[in-house]
Amino acid sequence: KATLTWFEEIFEEYDFVRDESDTGQAIQTSTGNYNHVAIYLDGMIYHASGQAGVVCQEPADFFESNHLYDLYVYPEMDIQSVKEKACKHLGAPYNASFYPNGAGFYCSQYMAEILPIFETIPMKFGDGEQEISDFWREYYRELGLPVPLNQPGTNPSQLAASPLLECKERNLHDSDF
């Protein structure tokens, strides 16, 4: 079993694998293996969620039995500095538009803000067949906004691929924590 003893230096990514929202599946289809990212600092999970915006949660309230989790570490992380930045943004809304200058933060945007080691990349919204999938066309139609295709942004899979991170554990279940 994995322990929480080295979590203060853990940069955590998680992969949905099973039961997940349509948005989560669309993110994974467009960008890679992951659909969400969070960070564990001093016993708490910090992340930006579509339901609550930027929050700090107890691990028991965060981990879900129908998800698999991969753990990453950034060995050079200044925990105190990252925690100060993480706390500064608590209560910010979720950036549902994924626009670079949208109000609030989406999950990987929040991570890149509090741990500024990641570059932005052109955002993708395709599904392997179309440059913009039907899901994202409808999503942005409902928002009344154009799809921000190729706008600068981040995504969880891109963050996980950073050469600055080390993968510590893969395919962990909620019961492993």
Residue ranges and their predicted role:
Residues 1-73, 94-105, 120:
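Glycine-rich catalytic cores of cysteine/serine-nucleophile enzymes that process amide/ester linkages
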Residues 97-177:
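Activation targets extended, charge/polar-rich intrinsically disordered C-terminal tails
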Residues 74-77, 154:
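Short coil/turn linker and secondary-structure boundary residues
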Residues 78, 82-86, 103, 107-110:
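Stable alpha-helical elements in mature extracytoplasmic
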